[in-house]
Amino acid sequence: MKKKVLVGMSGGVDSSVAAYLLKEQGYEVIGVTMQIWQDDEEFIEKEGGCCSLSAVADARRVANKIGIPFYVMNFKDAFKRNVIDYFVDEYMEGRTPNPCIACNKFIKFSSFLDKAMAMGIDYVATGHYAIIEKHNDRYIIKKSEDDRKDQTYALYNLTQFQLERTLMPCGQYKKSKIREIAKEIGLRVHNKKDSEEICFIPDNDHGRYIKNRFPNKVREGNFVDKQGNILGTHKGIVYYTIGQRKGLGIAFGKPMYVVDINPFRNEVVLGDLEDLLNTELIAKDINYIPFDTLKDPMEVEAKIRYSQTPSKAIITPIEDGRVRVNFHEKQRAITKGQSVVFYKDDLLIGGGIIEK
């Protein structure tokens, strides 16, 4: 009897080819687009986002082409609660969230997987560029064949339960090959542009998005230097993130960067590039993939943002399940709320949220 797999289809080329590859491998494939858009004109009408209405049409067209059933499933409430509300709250607290990591943790590999299990379906699948393997009774995640498209940074939260029930067929290929396969089988999405923006913010202007929804919470405040001297007026702390130089709306005669955000005083602290450089951070909410807990310091390569090349570091377990990360070289703009992710060569060790 064929194993069943529920494929999350965003209307893009990766998830479309993932569905095709799994069908070719002999699975009984069911395509699903997760309805996460809110009752919001700009979100609904937005073209090209990973879960917009136009994406549903693309996904349905692909499903028809490759001959699999297709459904739209409603995850609006879970998405609002776990992704949008978290996103807004983090910015209001002066931190910089990563909504894609939250979506993977709470929606794609939790709510979506729960739905599949309830339907008696064996697996869920996505178009992520990562490789899941089983080694000595434990599931691991390795970097994909395509270094440039590798998405393991956003997958460090996956549990053994989730990995056992997840398929990622695109991880074995380079993006160029995925597009080639899509073209060969006649999928119109073969040359569809990759989605790079936050799916629920059409223009990627998170400050404007939050201000529109909570106009009373976003207040002007002071730009200050490290000594607390007032340098000017900012639009609201939600508009800024650590390391930001452009868009400050004020000229200083030299480059100035956001080096800290104080939500309690509603202040944005500005400083020099040197103020952004650091070798140490503390991370919380740690999840490990190849093992359950870390008892001793470990040499790893770590990165503090998605597009960064990993840097050598030592991770040391400390109290409350947190870790101290000491980099061999200074890192620029270590940002509270973002994730730090650990590797050993191409093996994903785990990661957590940067606390300080």
Curated annotation (Swiss-Prot):
It comes from the Bacteria. CDD domains: MnmA_TRMU-like. The gene is mnmA2. ATP binds at residues 8-15, 34, 127. Keywords: ATP-binding, Cytoplasm, Disulfide bond, Nucleotide-binding, RNA-binding, Transferase, tRNA processing, tRNA-binding. Coiled coil: none annotated. The lineage of its organism: Bacteria, Bacillati, Bacillota, Clostridia, Eubacteriales. GO terms for biological process: tRNA wobble position uridine thiolation. It catalyses: S-sulfanyl-L-cysteinyl-[protein] + uridine(34) in tRNA + AH2 + ATP = 2-thiouridine(34) in tRNA + L-cysteinyl-[protein] + A + AMP + diphosphate + H(+). Catalyzes the 2-thiolation of uridine at the wobble position (U34) of tRNA, leading to the formation of s(2)U34. It holds the Pfam family tRNA_Me_trans. The active site is at 103 (nucleophile), 199 (cysteine persulfide intermediate). This is tRNA-specific 2-thiouridylase MnmA 2. GO terms for molecular function: ATP binding; tRNA binding; tRNA-uridine 2-sulfurtransferase activity. It comes from Clostridium botulinum (strain Okra / Type B1). PANTHER family: MITOCHONDRIAL TRNA-SPECIFIC 2-THIOURIDYLASE 1, TRNA 5-METHYLAMINOMETHYL-2-THIOURIDYLATE -METHYLTRANSFERASE. GO terms for cellular component: cytoplasm.
